């Protein structure tokens, strides 16, 4: 049983392992733990071949796909073989027409009929008029039979009077080799039909010629000639097999590159799509598109901007919904922090589904508050109706939490209609938000509402057109802001029947009585997948409603709808369906290969007609560099050709010593060239200097061409020297008269020296490292040298050969007539009385026809090589474009979520109820607000409806963000901005135990090392104050920061897997928020525990005293005033503040 050999097998040579080492990509960052590898098994049906030449892909399905691809690629070369056959028919027609007589009519008609068949077959195959099965299964064998019939017809009809063992042997060897390079069949059938053709041809010639022999001496000569024929055929078969192997190896490499490129492209597209979906779940598409456009600008364009880019847009006539959980404090007391976050995650995931169904754009989640907007970014006439239906559904959904927790929690919902300014502020941790007076009103509508009811304003009421029953809301009695503004409010009672009809038309019938969607009622208690403190996930169940989600995606165009595609992650995970996935991937690969094969990529790229070189010099240079380098197999073919050439010449003329000398010298020289060419392929087996020299030849075009020319020159010179030596040996002592007897040697059958020249043409074709123009030059060298010898130096030899052949084979009267003809100048072939064209001309024409055929094939191979190169370039460019888009999307995503969190959500599709969370024991939290910005903000026309005020706030927040680029603040993470409040935390890193400093556990560190990040956070707060001072000095404003800080443990995580919102929760966060809200402008307020730690780092404090904090009672607080010792920054420098004005001395 054959051994299954992978890429790392030491017996598998470096050449092949390098070319087939295609380990398909895995992405460790995305949690893909499996790599897709394709192994190559050294097995096959043609067991007579060496083991390393029997290549088969594993699995079998991939091998079958490759065989289809390979035969499809070879199908076009089938047309090349048809052209070869047509050229042979043209040759026969010319040879018969030149010396036309009655006995030439039969071969002439057969050749003409064959030529017509070749043309018809060419048209049918070229136009694709034949069924695919016939074209691939029948036509190759039909063409083989047609060519064989033409050769035997020419042999039997044209040489009927004087058969010789060398008749049509050159053409037979030519077509045998052509079968290997053109037929779209597996290697085994080609070997079989080639052997059958050669055996039949040899038997026919042997039997026919043997019947004409007159003595035993002629029988020995016939045996040597038959053996010479065998060596010619053997050479054609061996070199043909090597050619097939080299083509197979090249196509396997191209096939694997195509498969790898497809998987990489699919991988990149999938990741890019995931990033885009994640991005669009956080940001509206119009904002994300604008951000991507700006990110692609070069730095010079960005430097010309006077202000930081702000993505802010005005949206009028939208409905704003605020919803708050009533009784959240009671709920917090009944649950641990992690249980509370789980519960919120599940509840808000339900809200996100409802938001998708009712065309809402969720804006933010602020603790237990959820707010969204309808009519943004795309305007809807029924925005108010949708928002109210959303509110009713949320009230219904909270009943599940009430039943599960046995608490009195409820939802208080407020809706207001008006104008908002929507966008993002700052340069880091982007979150979409809205600002306007109407947003404030909507917030107050929620605050002044009643639990379990939907509270709406007069402006929302005006948009309902009486579609809901309402009652007075009396919101002013519960909210001073509403009372001061004189806003009339209402409470929704129930929907009228018309609303159901509207819901059915606009929401696809998703509403039920009381306005609550049926899907909001839980079918079973939901169990949540969460991450433990070590970051590992565990799943305890799911109630993800996939059908509802798909319906919501179909109903809401703004909801991210991922494209249907084959997911590589699923390929890695779904073990049960592995074979089905492999089939699907192979099908996609086949479609991709068909698509690129049908594209005329070479025609699209400007190339010169004659040379086929690219008109673009840079493209031509790239092609030259990437062109297939020297192949050991190609130079090995030259060695095989020279060996068979020597055997043929020795068999024909065993007494000529020059044959032996040229063989030994030529083989030594060719072995030197072969070893030098293989040193770069097997660097471990050769000295370093030789490897370096071989590599230099590979890299240099002119050196490669020179090396190839040397090989062909050696073959040509060996043949030329042997021909001239033979001529001198046999022609010198004798006087050339018609009646002279010759003693064998080249004089008996000089055609064989032309046949070995055909082998030199075959060796030229095998030089894959040179262009078709170089091959044409070398083939002209071979053909020109043989032509010169045939027509000049060897002219007497061929004349004597024809003279003796016709004299011996015919009757005395016919022989006398032919001798008279041969003795006249009519030997040039123009005299119609000659039975055959003189051998010196027929052999010369044969060489030119074969050279022309091989040149046509070389152009085809060159075109194929350039096509493969362009495919590779296009795939590379396509991957670069996808990668570039992925890079920008990734930059956006990681600017909205921490990198380790984004990586988690890009790994695979998450359920809405799935929770990502991590616990941290020792972190710092900071809130920094601009209390007097509210006085600065106005929506007057002079401020462009408030946009210019927000532009100034954007500059402030952007400058705060730019501080985070300093390496000193690498452990500080911006959490979010809430209006004009900036929230950040320190030590929130993926590693729970180390907080990102070292790999050692916290038990191994001192308190000062463990809390260094808290000191950095305090430095960051001081830097923010300095930054704001610089801004005030330049803008003549007097903004002041009110900052609160605290330290302790938190739970960090993401609520909503499909629309992720990253935040931190816990008592530490609550206290930090209270430190800010109860603080004093211009100061940083901390509690006593935080003050004790920060004192160790040289920070100065002033005692404020006990203050009352809601939910905590009285707390002793301190104001941080500065630092005695300056912070140690890299290179001893201090923080470079944005907008800092440096006075020059």
From Swiss-Prot:
Keywords: ATP-binding, Calmodulin-binding, cAMP biosynthesis, Cell membrane, Cell projection, Cytoplasm, Glycoprotein, Golgi apparatus, Isopeptide bond, Lyase, Magnesium, Manganese, Membrane, Metal-binding, Nucleotide-binding, Olfaction, Phosphoprotein, Repeat, Sensory transduction, Transmembrane, Transmembrane helix, Ubl conjugation. Glycans are attached at residue 735. Mg(2+) 2 binds at residues 324-325, 368. Its cofactor is Mg(2+); Mn(2+). Mg(2+) 1 binds at residues 324, 368. The protein contains two modules with six transmembrane helices each; both are required for catalytic activity. Isolated N-terminal or C-terminal modules have no catalytic activity, but when they are brought together, enzyme activity is restored. The active site is at the interface of the two modules. This is Adenylate cyclase type 3. It comes from Mus musculus. The lineage of its organism: Eukaryota, Metazoa, Chordata, Craniata, Vertebrata.
């Amino acid at each position: 049983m054959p051994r299954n050999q992978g890429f790392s097998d030491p017996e598998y040579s470096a050449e092949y392992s390098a070319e087939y080492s295609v380990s398909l990509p895995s992405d460790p960052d995305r949690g893909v733990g499996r790599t897709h590898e394709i192994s190559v098994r050294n097995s096959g049906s043609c067991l007579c071949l060496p083991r390393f030449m029997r290549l088969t892909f594993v699995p079998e399905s991939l091998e079958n796909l490759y065989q289809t691809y390979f035969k499809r690629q070879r199908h076009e070369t089938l047309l090349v073989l048809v052209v070869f056959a047509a050229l042979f028919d043209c040759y026969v027609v010319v040879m018969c027409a030149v010396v036309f007589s009655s006995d030439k009519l039969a071969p002439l008609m057969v050749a003409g009929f064959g030529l017509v068949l070749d043309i018809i077959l060419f048209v049918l195959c070229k136009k694709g008029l034949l069924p695919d099965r016939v074209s691939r299964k029948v036509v190759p064998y039909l063409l083989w039979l047609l060519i064989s019939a033409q050769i035997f017809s020419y042999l039997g009809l044209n040489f009927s009077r004087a058969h010789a063992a060398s008749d049509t042997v050159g053409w037979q060897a030519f077509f045998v080799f052509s079968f290997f390079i053109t037929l779209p069949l597996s290697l085994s059938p080609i070997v079989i039909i080639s052997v059958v053709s050669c055996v039949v041809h040899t038997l026919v010639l042997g039997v026919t010629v043997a019947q004409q022999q007159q003595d035993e001496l002629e029988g020995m000569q016939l045996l040597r000639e038959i053996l010479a024929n065998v060596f010619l055929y053997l050479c054609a078969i061996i070199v043909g097999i090597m050619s097939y192997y080299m083509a197979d190896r090249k196509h396997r490499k191209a096939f694997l590159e195509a498969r790898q490129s497809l998987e990489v492209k699919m991988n990149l597209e999938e990741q890019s799509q995931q990033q885009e979906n994640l991005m669009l779940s956080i940001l509206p598409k119009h904002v994300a598109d604008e951000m991507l456009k700006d990110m692609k600008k070069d730095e010079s364009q960005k430097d010309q901007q006077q202000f930081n880019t702000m993505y802010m847009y005005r949206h009028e006539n939208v409905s704003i919904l605020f919803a708050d959980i009533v009784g959240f404090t009671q709920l917090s007391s009944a649950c641990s922090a992690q249980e509370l976050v789980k519960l919120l995650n599940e509840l808000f995931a339900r809200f996100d589904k409802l938001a998708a169904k009712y065309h809402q754009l969720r804006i933010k989640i602020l603790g237990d508050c959820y707010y969204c907007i309808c009519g943004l970014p795309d305007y809807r006439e029924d925005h108010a109706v949708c928002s109210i239906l959303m509110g009713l559904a949320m009230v219904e959904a909270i009943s599940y939490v009430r039943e599960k927790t046995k608490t009195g929690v409820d939802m208080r919902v407020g809706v207001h209609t008006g104008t908002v300014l929507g966008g993002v502020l700052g340069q880091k941790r982007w979150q979409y938000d809205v600002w306007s007076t109407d947003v404030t009103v909507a917030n107050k509508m929620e605050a002044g509402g009643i639990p379990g009811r939907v509270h709406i304003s007069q402006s929302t009421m005006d948009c309902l057109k009486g579609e809901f029953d309402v009652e007075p809301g009396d919101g002013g009695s519960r909210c001073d802001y509403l009372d001061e503004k004189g806003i009339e409010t209402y409470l929704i009672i129930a929907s009228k029947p018309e609303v159901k009809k509207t819901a059915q038309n606009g929401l696809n019938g998703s509403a039920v009585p009381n306005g609550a969607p049926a899907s909001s009622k839980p079918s079973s208690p939901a169990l949540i997948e969460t991450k433990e403190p070590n970051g590992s996930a565990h799943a305890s169940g799911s109630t993800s409603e996939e059908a509802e989600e798909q319906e919501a995606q179909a109903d809401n165009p703004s909801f991210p709808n991922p494209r249907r595609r084959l997911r590589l992650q699923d390929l890695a995970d779904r073990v049960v369906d592995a074979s089905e996935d492999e089939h699907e991937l192979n099908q996609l690969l086949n479609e991709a290969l068909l698509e690129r094969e049908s594209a005329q990529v070479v025609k699209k790229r400007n190339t010169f007609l004659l040379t086929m070189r690219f008109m673009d010099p840079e493209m031509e240079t790239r092609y030259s560099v990437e062109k297939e380098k020297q192949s050991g197999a190609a130079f090995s073919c030259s060695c095989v050709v020279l060996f068979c050439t020597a055997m043929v010449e020795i068999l024909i003329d065993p007494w000529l010593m020059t044959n032996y000398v040229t063989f030994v010298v030529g083989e030594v020289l060719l072995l030197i060239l072969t070893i030098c060419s293989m040193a770069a392929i097997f660097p471990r087996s050769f000295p370093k200097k030789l490897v370096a020299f071989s590599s230099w030849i590979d890299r240099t075009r002119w050196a490669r061409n020179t090396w190839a020319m040397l090989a062909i020159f050696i073959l040509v010179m060996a043949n030329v020297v042997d021909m001239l030596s033979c001529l001198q040996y046999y022609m010198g002592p004798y006087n050339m008269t018609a009646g002279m007897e010759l003693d064998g040697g080249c004089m008996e059958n000089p055609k064989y020296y032309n046949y070995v020249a055909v082998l030199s043409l075959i060796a030229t074709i095998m030089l894959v490292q040179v262009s078709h123009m170089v091959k044409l030059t070398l083939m002209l060298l071979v053909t020109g040298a043989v032509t010169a010898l045939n027509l000049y130096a060897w002219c007497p030899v061929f004349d004597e050969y024809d003279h003796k052949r016709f004299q011996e084979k015919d009757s005395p009267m016919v022989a006398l007539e032919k001798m008279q003809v041969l003795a006249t100048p009519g030997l040039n072939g123009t005299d119609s009385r000659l039975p055959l064209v003189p051998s010196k001309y027929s052999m010369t024409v044969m060489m030119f026809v074969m050279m022309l055929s091989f040149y046509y094939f070389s152009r085809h191979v060159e075109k194929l090589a350039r096509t493969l190169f362009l495919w590779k370039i296009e795939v590379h460019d396509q991957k670069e474009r996808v990668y570039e888009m992925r890079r920008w999307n990734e930059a956006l995503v990681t600017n909205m979520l921490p990198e380790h969190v984004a990586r988690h959500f890009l790994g695979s599709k998450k359920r809405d109820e799935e929770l990502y969370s991590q616990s941290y024991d020792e972190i710092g939290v900071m809130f920094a607000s601009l209390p007097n910005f509210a006085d600065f903000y106005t929506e007057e026309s002079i401020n462009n409806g408030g946009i210019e005020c927000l532009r100034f706030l954007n500059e402030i927040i952007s400058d705060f963000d730019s501080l985070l680029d300093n390496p000193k603040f690498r452990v500080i993470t911006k959490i979010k901005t809430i209006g004009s409040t900036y929230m950040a935390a320190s030590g929130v890193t993926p590693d729970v135990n180390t907080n990102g400093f070292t790999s050692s556990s916290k038990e191994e560190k001192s308190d000062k090392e463990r809390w260094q990040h808290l000191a950095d956070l305090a430095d960051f707060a001081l830097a923010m104050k300095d930054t704001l001072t610089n801004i005030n000095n330049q803008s003549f404003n007097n903004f002041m920061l009110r900052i609160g800080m605290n330290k302790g443990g938190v739970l960090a995580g993401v609520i909503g897997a499909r629309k992720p919102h990253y935040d931190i929760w816990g008592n530490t966060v609550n206290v930090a928020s209270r430190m800010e809200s109860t603080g004093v402008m211009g100061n940083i307020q901390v509690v006593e525990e935080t003050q004790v730690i920060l004192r160790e780092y040289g920070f100065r404090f002033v005692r404020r005293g006990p203050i009352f904090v809601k939910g905590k009672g009285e707390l002793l607080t301190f104001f941080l005033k500065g630092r005695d010792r300056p912070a140690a920054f890299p290179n001893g420098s201090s923080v470079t503040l944005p907008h800092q004005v440096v006075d020059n001395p």
